[in-house]
Amino acid sequence: MSEATTSTETLQDEAVLLVGHGSRREKSNEQVRELASELEGRLGLPVDAAFLELAEPAIDEAIAGLARTVSQVSVVHLSLFAASHVKNDVPLAVTQAREAHPELTINNGAHLGVHPAILDLLDDRVAAVEAELGVDRTDDEVAVVVCARGSSDPDANADVHKLARLLYEGREFGRCEASFIGVTEPLLDETLHDIAKTRPDAVAVVPYMLGDGVLTGRIKDGAREFDAEYPYVDAAPGEPLGTDNRLLDVLGDRWQEARTDS
């Protein structure tokens, strides 16, 4: 990343560390770096990327590098949910970094979570599926499934249900359900079979994932298999969140919250 700074005095000695999970698929890691670069342009200060596992640099290594050039680092999580990594792994790494660099102020931010920009992005993903299937929520019965990876953490799963409910509110969907590809219930297959009983005109299955990885592929396959099994219901999968600019809105808000303790 460039060592860009702003003319605002309070930001001249500050940097952001965007923490992604890390993957064996380099494409997924590049997504984190791409978002870091775009966030740097948005905020006008240095933004570096770090990873929890499977990719480099690790959090401690990245913070050590930043400690040489700035006096304040705000850690921002590129995580959809507040599961164990957000609740345990990152805070531990931040605590250790504070001990290693007592001269450095390190702020630990929140995960992406539930945010109006994400709801807007999900709505657009559904609209793209409607266009593909030739249906319109105002004239046709369109059901939506928001499908996430599933977690052993109840807070993470609750966020998916909340997102599905908020996506339904104020929009003309027939129904909007939360489902999961593993770990917890309801699983995608059972959710789709339950929806089929009501015979909607179309079902849009939206992967609540950042990238187009293995789990996103399973979600898309599940939607296509359902479409083949139920000829009286048109179904198709949407795209994951990707690197849409609206994620920068969320990350920018999480950065501001982290550095101001709000």
Predicted regions located by residue number:
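Active-site-proximal alpha-helix that buttresses catalytic centers in soluble enzyme cores
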Residues: 1-262
